[in-house]
């Protein structure tokens, strides 16, 4: 029973799917995809549940969401293990993901009141009231890198706003999706308010093509995001929130403390085995002896990183990638860049064939032509050297993406220049690119997406503003507009 539709657990009628741990190959989940008819059934259930859910007092919706938060806290260890075993990330990092899920709920509730909710302005002859209304039935597409935390950033604000949902987790993380939905069930969500459909491309296409959807909230790759954008083009009545990837630059301009700069770079490029959309993909290092020393130290320390199993003791900094195929894709990208003329500074290495354990790779591409402007979702860092800061900004902006950008420098003026000229939604100074706060907007421009799917700013796209001019009485104005004559004529 792997689908949850209209409050019932049912068996999918689509393709059989099996999920294994990406490092041990242990089978950890089995089930069937939802077919097109079941996807449509989930949408019908969400549509039927919408009027009653939307009319619930906000306090009632909030109470269920807060019960979910309490269940997350009570089952934190269990969910941590599920996420770690399914994604391959270390236990310590999976635990931080569950903590982020819990913390985001209180922020989402506060954001609803601050950014949406209801506001009234008194007028001479009545009032002007701003209210927010839910869109209706929304589809939520989840990614695999943070299979609990990132969908949660759509689901919680959308439910608080009064929407009903169909959630499709990544086909690479079905177990996490199912585990989280079971907690929502225990929290007391009414039937049909949140529905779970498992599956891959066919299930996703069936979901995104439903005429009765009022919108789609997506976190994932740029290629899939572009497909969804094309599919929903010409349908302005549907809200489409896209959070996609990045080909993110980190500029190393002025290094006062080389080890601190190396630590920041490791956190930016290789945490989560390079599987964060904000990870640094392009390292821009100033030419000269200081830059040379920084790169030598980076290669030295990065070369000591040994990925390990989720439950290793002591815990590793990074675990496996989401699949052995993902690790192979990173290896192929590295070889492609070598073939273009890149100079390998640190060769990535498969720790064990057939697993997703992969050591970091670093390759210099200064002066190399035709380097693909793509997001390689893994621990591969591309290096360019530059002569002056204006050139660094030009290199940083030489991408169709625009998610995150960072600067290591002691010069505040350079950061202020970067703030003005960088084409990115996140611009950091002496901070890792991969840090994020739920109280701040998260997202970018260009191929990185449109809206800002964090707990605070997600409220903006989960409801639409409605303005009302209101008066309890209807009276004739004392002063009429020119040309209007309401004088009463005497009867003949």
Curated annotation (Swiss-Prot):
It comes from the Bacteria. PROSITE patterns: ALDEHYDE_DEHYDR_CYS, ALDEHYDE_DEHYDR_GLU. The keyword Ribonucleoprotein does not apply. NAD(+) binds at residues 220-225. It is an enzyme of class 1 (oxidoreductase). One of its GO terms (molecular function) is succinylglutamate-semialdehyde dehydrogenase activity. It catalyses: N-succinyl-L-glutamate 5-semialdehyde + NAD(+) + H2O = N-succinyl-L-glutamate + NADH + 2 H(+). Pathway: Amino-acid degradation; L-arginine degradation via AST pathway; L-glutamate and succinate from L-arginine: step 4/5. Keywords: Arginine metabolism, NAD, Oxidoreductase. GO terms for biological process: arginine catabolic process to glutamate; arginine catabolic process to succinate. The keyword Oxidoreductase applies. The active site is at residues 243, 277. Its EC number is 1.2.1.71. InterPro entries: Ald_DH/histidinol_DH, Ald_DH_C, Ald_DH_CS_CYS, Ald_DH_CS_GLU, Ald_DH_N, Aldehyde_DH_dom, SuccinylGlu_semiald_DH_AstD. Gene3D superfamilies: Aldehyde Dehydrogenase, Chain A, domain 1, Aldehyde Dehydrogenase, Chain A, domain 2. Belongs to the aldehyde dehydrogenase family. AstD subfamily. Catalyzes the NAD-dependent reduction of succinylglutamate semialdehyde into succinylglutamate. HAMAP family: Aldedh_AstD. This is N-succinylglutamate 5-semialdehyde dehydrogenase. It comes from Salmonella dublin (strain CT_02021853).
């Amino acid at each position: 029973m792997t689908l949850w539709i209209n409050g019932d657990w049912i068996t999918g009628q689509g393709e059989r799917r099996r999920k294994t741990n990406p490092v041990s190959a242990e089978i950890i989940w089995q089930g069937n995809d939802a077919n097109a008819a079941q996807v449509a059934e989930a949408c019908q259930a969400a549509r039927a549940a919408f009027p009653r859910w939307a009319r619930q007092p906000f306090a009632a919706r909030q109470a269920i969401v807060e019960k979910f938060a309490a269940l997350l806290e009570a089952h934190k260890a269990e969910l941590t293990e599920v996420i770690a075993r399914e994604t391959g990330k270390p236990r310590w990092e999976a635990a931080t993901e569950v903590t982020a899920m819990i913390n985001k709920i209180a922020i989402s509730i506060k954001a609803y009141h601050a950014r949406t909710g209801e506001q009234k302005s008194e007028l001479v002859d009545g009032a002007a009231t701003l209210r927010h209304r839910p869109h209706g039935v929304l589809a939520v597409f989840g990614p695999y890198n943070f299979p609990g935390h990132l969908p949660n950033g759509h689901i919680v604000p959308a439910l608080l706003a009064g929407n009903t949902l169909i959630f499709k987790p990544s086909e690479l993380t079905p177990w996490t999706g199912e585990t989280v939905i079971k907690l929502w069930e225990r929290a007391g969500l009414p039937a049909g308010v949140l529905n779970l459909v498992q599956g891959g491309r066919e299930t996703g296409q069936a979901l995104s093509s439903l005429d009765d959807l009022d919108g789609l909230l997506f976190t994932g790759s740029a290629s899939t995001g572009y497909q969804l954008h094309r599919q929903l083009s010409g349908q302005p009545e549907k809200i489409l929130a896209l959070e996609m990837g990045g080909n993110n630059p980190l500029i190393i301009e002025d290094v006062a403390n080389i080890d601190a700069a190396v630590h920041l770079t490791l956190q930016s490029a290789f945490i989560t085995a390079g599987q964060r959309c904000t990870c640094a993909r392009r390292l821009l290092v100033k030419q000269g002896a200081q830059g040379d020393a920084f790169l030598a130290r980076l290669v030295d320390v990065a070369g000591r990183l040994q990925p390990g199993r989720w439950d290793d003791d002591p815990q590793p900094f990074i675990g496996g990638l989401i699949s052995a195929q993902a690790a192979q894709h990173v290896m192929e990208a590295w070889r492609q860049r070598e073939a273009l003329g890149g100079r390998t500074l640190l060769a990535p290495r498969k720790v064990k064939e057939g697993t997703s354990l992969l050591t970091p790779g670093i390759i210099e591409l200064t002066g190399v032509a035709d380097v693909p402007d793509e997001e390689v979702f893994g621990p591969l860092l591309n290096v360019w050297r530059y002569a002056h800061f204006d050139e660094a900004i030009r290199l940083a902006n030489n991408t169709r993406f625009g998610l995150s950008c960072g600067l290591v420098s002691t010069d505040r003026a350079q950061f202020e220049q970067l703030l003005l000229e960088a084409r990115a939604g996140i611009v950091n100074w002496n901070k890792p690119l991969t840090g994020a706060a739920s109280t701040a907007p998260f997202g970018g421009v260009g191929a990185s997406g449109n809206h800002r799917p964090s707990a605070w700013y997600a409220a903006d796209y989960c409801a639409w503003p409605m303005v009302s001019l209101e008066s309890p009485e209807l009276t004739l104005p004392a002063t009429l507009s020119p040309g209007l004559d309401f004088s009463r004529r005497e009867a003949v």
